[in-house]
Amino acid sequence: MSIKEDKWIRKMALAHGMIEPFADGQVNVDAETGEKLISYGLSSYGYDLRLSREFKVFTNVYNSLVDPKHFTEDTFISITDDVCIIPPNSFALAHSVEYFRIPRNILTMCIGKSTYARCGLIVNVTPFEPEWEGYVTIEISNTTPLPAKIYANEGIAQVLFFEADEMCEVSYAERKGKYQKQQGITVPFV
């Protein structure tokens, strides 16, 4: 497997709709206000995706048990805003602004941005498999004993694109993966 460079990412985004909307280059300042942003957009060997304005913040209001086989959404509070406050030692789910369409010979890995990591916020996103498409559901954990703020429409994680040496026998789309074409924040289900 080899990692793909900015020229390839740009070509695939513009000619094949691999990333929509696509920011051609790193955006780190709001063009209207001049305010500094946590960067997003095309980088040398990846693409920094953004958080949308929709969040689900974990809460234990109902004294629930977290069970991935029998998950209930009442463990979350839904928020739509430009920022989200994650309680201490808790987490939030969000989704990307960008919609991704992954080619059959590509697998991605997603790594949290250092700006958030240095604040004790850990981003977890599973790989985008060959021929997966959709908005990315993103998990952000606050490992600190203090509340933490995350920002909508700013960078949260970098997607790295790896080209396989050989084509896979069965793609995510062909095996009818359960998170194919997900819209918005998708909670776990079996």
Curated annotation (Swiss-Prot):
Residues that, per the record, bind dCTP: 113-118, 158, 172, 181-182
Domain of life: Bacteria
Family label: Belongs to the dCTP deaminase family.
Gene: dcd
Name assigned to this protein: dCTP deaminase
Subunit structure as annotated in this protein's UniProt entry: Homotrimer.
Catalytic activity: dCTP + H2O + H(+) = dUTP + NH4(+)
Keywords: Hydrolase, Nucleotide metabolism, Nucleotide-binding
EC number, UniProt record: 3.5.4.13
HAMAP family: dCTP_deaminase
Gene Ontology terms for molecular function: dCTP deaminase activity; nucleotide binding
GO biological process: dUMP biosynthetic process; dUTP biosynthetic process; nucleobase-containing small molecule interconversion
Pathway, per record: Pyrimidine metabolism; dUMP biosynthesis; dUMP from dCTP (dUTP route): step 1/2
Active site per database record: 139
Keyword Ribonucleoprotein listed: no
